[in-house]
C-alpha cells in the first residue's frame, strides 16, 4: 500500500478548504520583542509579531533571561531523567513552591506543557476516581477534551458559560457519582471570561470538584498574577487550578495546584507525569523568576491593558469587526478561511505584520479570524501601523465593515 498517497489526499483536501496551516519561520531576538527576524525569502527581514502568547514579553525580560543563563551555567542543559529517576532538581521544587504560593494552595506539580498537564490530570482523575462523571464546558480546550476522552469516564457537555445548564446537568446525575466540573477562565479564541462565581456556586451546591484551566489568565489577572480566580477571590473555593508557564510567564511548561493529597495523587498515577523527562532546570529557574517578578510588578499588566484598550478603540473607529470581550485577546473576524489566509499573507509580505490566521479546526467553520494579542512592548507607532494596514486591506479584499 502506498501510504504517502493516503497522507497526500487528506492534505490536498485541507488546502482546497483553505485550512492548511503554514508556519512562519521567525527568529526571536533578545531585547527586540515584538520585533522578530523573518526567514521568509519573499517577505521583509523584520516583522512585528501581533499574535504571540508571550503576552507580557517576559520571555525577553532581562531578569528571566539571566536566570536561565545562570542556571545553565550551574546545572547544565537537561534534567537528566524523569522526575522519578534522577530528574527532580532543586529548581523544580522551588518552582512548585512558588506556584503553590501563587494560587494559595498546599502544593503544585510541574508538567512539560500546559497541554500535558490538562491531559494527564483529567485523564487520571476520570480513570481513577470511582463513578467519575466529568462535566465539560462546550468550548473547553483540546487538551481537556483529550484528557477526558482518554479517562473513559462518563462525559457530560454543558452549554458554554451557562451555569443554569450546568445546574440541570449536575442535578440529573446519580447521588453516588464523583462529579468533576471542568472549565476555563479565559477562553483563548473568543477571549470571553467564564462566570466563575456562579459556576463555583453551582458546583458546591452539588458537591462537585472544580477543575479550572487558567492558562490564558495566569500572570495577566489578579494583584499577583494568580489569574481570574485570584482577581475574584475564588481561588480557595476551586479544587484544582491548572496553568502554563509558556504564555504570560514567557518560558515553557505546565502545572496543577491543589491540596497536598490531590497533587500527590496525580504525581503517583498520571502517566503523563511519570514517564517523561523533566523540564530542564534552567527553564524552571527562569519560570520561577518570571512568576516572582509578576507577583510584585504591576507595570507590565497595566501597560498591556492600556495597549489593548487603544487597539480596540482604533478598530471601533474604523469599523473593523472584532469580538467584544473583557480580556486581552482581540479576535478580528474574517469568517472565510481563504480570505483569512490571504489577509495574513499580505500583512506579512507588504506590511511586515505577522498574525497567524485562525481557521478550522481551531475554531468552527465560518468563524475564521485573525487573533491579535497586544502587549506592553507594542508601541503606539506599532498600533498606528497595524490600523493603517487593516484599513487598507479591508478595502482591497472587500471585507464587510460590520459588528462581529
Predicted regions and their residues:
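Active-site phosphate-binding strand-loop segment of PLP-dependent enzymes
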Residues: 54, 156, 160-212
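Conserved N-terminal alpha-helix of the aminotransferase class I/II PLP-enzyme fold
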Residues: 65-113
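N-terminal "arm"/small-domain region of PLP-dependent enzymes with the aminotransferase-like
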Residues: 2-3, 12-75, 208
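PLP-dependent enzyme catalytic core of the Aspartate aminotransferase-like
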Residues: 55-58, 62, 66-70, 74, ...
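Conserved PLP-binding catalytic core of the aspartate aminotransferase-like
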Residues: 301-311, 316-352, 367, 374-376
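Active-site PLP attachment segment
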Residues: 224, 230-265
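PLP-dependent aminotransferase class I/II
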Residues: 248-315, 320-323
Amino acid at each position: 500500500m502506498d501510504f504517502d498517497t493516503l497522507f497526500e489526499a487528506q492534505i490536498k483536501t485541507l488546502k482546497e478548504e483553505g485550512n492548511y496551516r503554514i508556519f512562519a519561520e521567525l527568529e526571536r531576538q533578545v531585547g527586540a520583542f515584538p520585533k522578530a527576524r523573518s526567514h521568509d525569502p519573499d517577505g521583509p527581514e523584520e516583522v512585528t509579531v501581533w499574535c504571540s502568547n508571550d503576552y507580557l514579553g517576559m520571555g525577553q525580560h532581562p531578569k528571566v533571561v539571566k536566570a536561565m543563563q545562570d542556571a545553565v551555567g550551574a546545572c547544565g542543559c537537561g534534567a537528566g531523567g524523569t522526575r522519578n529517576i534522577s530528574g527532580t532538581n532543586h529548581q523544580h521544587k522551588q518552582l512548585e513552591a512558588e506556584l503553590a504560593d501563587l494560587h494559595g494552595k498546599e502544593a503544585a506539580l510541574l508538567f512539560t506543557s500546559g497541554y500535558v498537564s490538562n491531559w494527564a490530570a483529567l485523564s487520571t482523575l476520570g480513570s481513577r476516581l470511582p463513578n467519575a462523571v466529568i462535566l465539560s464546558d462546550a468550548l473547553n480546550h483540546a487538551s481537556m477534551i483529550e484528557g477526558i476522552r482518554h479517562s473513559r469516564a462518563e462525559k457530560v457537555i454543558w452549554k458554554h458559560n451557562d451555569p443554569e445548564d450546568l445546574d440541570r446537568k449536575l442535578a440529573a446525575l446519580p447521588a453516588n457519582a464523583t462529579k468533576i466540573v471542568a472549565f476555563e477562565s479565559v477562553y483563548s479564541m473568543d477571549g470571553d471570561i467564564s462566570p466563575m462565581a456562579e459556576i463555583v456556586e453551582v458546583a458546591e451546591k452539588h458537591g462537585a470538584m472544580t477543575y479550572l484551566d487558567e492558562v490564558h489568565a495566569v500572570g495577566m489577572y489578579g494583584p499577583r498574577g494568580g489569574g481570574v480566580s485570584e482577581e475574584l477571590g475564588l481561588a480557595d473555593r476551586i479544587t484544582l487550578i491548572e496553568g502554563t508557564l509558556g504564555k504570560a510567564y514567557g518560558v515553557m511548561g505546565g502545572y496543577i495546584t491543589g491540596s497536598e493529597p490531590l497533587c500527590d495523587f496525580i504525581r503517583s498515577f498520571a502517566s503523563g507525569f511519570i514517564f517523561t523527562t523533566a523540564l530542564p532546570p534552567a527553564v524552571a529557574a527562569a519560570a520561577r523568576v518570571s512568576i516572582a517578578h509578576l507577583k510584585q510588578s504591576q507595570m507590565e499588566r497595566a501597560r498591556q491593558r492600556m495597549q489593548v484598550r487603544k487597539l480596540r478603540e482604533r478598530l471601533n473607529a474604523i469599523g473593523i469587526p472584532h469580538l467584544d470581550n473583557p480580556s486581552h485577546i482581540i479576535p478580528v473576524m474574517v469568517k472565510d478561511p481563504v480570505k483569512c489566509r490571504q489577509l495574513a499573507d499580505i500583512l506579512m509580505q507588504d506590511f511586515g505584520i505577522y498574525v497567524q490566521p485562525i481557521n478550522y479546526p481551531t475554531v468552527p467553520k465560518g468563524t475564521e479570524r485573525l487573533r491579535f494579542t497586544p502587549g506592553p512592548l507594542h508601541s503606539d507607532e506599532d498600533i498606528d501601523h497595524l490600523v493603517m494596514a487593516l484599513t487598507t486591506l479591508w478595502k482591497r479584499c472587500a471585507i464587510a465593515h460590520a459588528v462581529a
